[in-house]
């Protein structure tokens, strides 16, 4: 394996986990640049600050669609500043990279010609499922939240059908988002706001496997 001792490390002199060096090697192999490894200040988790090839970076497959209006406004600001000042959050997945927080910035910078995107690369891929907690770039409306949740739900169902639904309460945030997501997905003109107040009081996470819970909710 390549020696990454030249990469800046914080705390200084700390021994990086093998998984972080492996991630740095993967980033370099993918044509990116691993610039620094550090422990973030809250949980002391190891992360990498890197430049990721824009061609290998995309939003997670289950998050909301890009907003044309937000892209336009963001593009105007970026054109004026000619700077990319906020790194996106990234996990390595499916032979590329997903950003659960920063997809509008990624898309805008790429459209403006950026070949690499500054990123905080997180070693734990499950962080990609914590979109609703992480994503402060653009406020979610009810439909956005519900559709993202049902996409995450179905992804988790495919990966781990025997996992228990209530164990994903943090990721899904509110149980009624699952139910509303099913309805929004089926009926494009569905008005979830009418039912959300009541549904939020009666819907809860189930102590059943995702397969069983999905069948019940469907």
Where on the chain are the PLM-derived regions?
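Solvent-exposed functional surfaces
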Residues: 4-14, 124, 128-218
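Short, charged/polar connector segments at secondary-structure boundaries
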Residues: 1-120, 163-174, 184-185, 189-192, ...
